[in-house]
Swiss-Prot record:
Gene3D superfamilies: SpoA-like
Induction pattern: Negatively regulated by HrpV.
Transmembrane domains' residue ranges: none
SUPFAM superfamilies registered for this protein in UniProt: Surface presentation of antigens (SPOA) (SSF101801)
Domain comment in the entry: The HrcQb-C domain interacts with the HrcQa C-terminal domain.
Entry's Gene Ontology cellular component terms: bacterial-type flagellum basal body; cytoplasm
Chain intervals with Basic and acidic residues compositional bias: 49-59
Protein name: Type III secretion protein HrcQb
Subcellular location: Cytoplasm
Compositional bias per record (Acidic residues), positions renumbered to this chain: 1-21
Gene source species: Pseudomonas syringae pv. syringae
């Protein structure tokens, strides 16, 4: 019997609804716990409700630096319009009210807020945190 025949026999014996192999289940649980601790997101609302009163912070992850971006809207220009831009040009931005911005981690929206002056520098005052799911 060839290796392919043995493999095919194993595949035919598998049930689509079998429980995951213990090692896979353990790895999935570790991955879920890491994501939850690192980003504060739980896989289900029930899990989140259970943990909201008993949230364990991970001191090892507290020093993890994340790249966040502030988005203040969208605009679309033709190449000709882009080439005509010069100092003093004013661009109309759509998708958000003046003075507002969205705080994002990659494509994930984290919060929304209002742009404010912080001792001569631009800041964001959070007005709404996106629900963690």
């Amino acid at each position: 019997m060839s290796t392919e025949d043995l493999y095919q026999d194993d595949v035919e014996m598998l049930d689509d609804y079998e429980e995951p192999v213990p090692e896979q289940a353990d790895q999935q649980q570790r991955d879920d716990e890491y994501a939850e601790h690192a980003f504060g997101y739980a896989d289900s609302d029930a899990e989140h409700e259970e943990q909201s009163g008993d949230h364990h912070e991970s001191p090892m992850l507290d020093s993890l630096e994340l790249d966040l971006t502030l988005r203040c809207g969208d605009l679309r220009l033709t190449l000709a319009e882009l080439r005509r831009l010069d100092a003093g040009s004013i661009l109309e931005v759509s998708g958000i009210a003046p003075g507002h911005a969205t705080l994002c981690h990659g494509e994930q929206v984290v919060a929304e807020g209002e742009l404010v002056d912080v001792e001569g520098r631009l800041g964001l005052q959070i007005t709404r945190l996106v629900a963690r799911s």
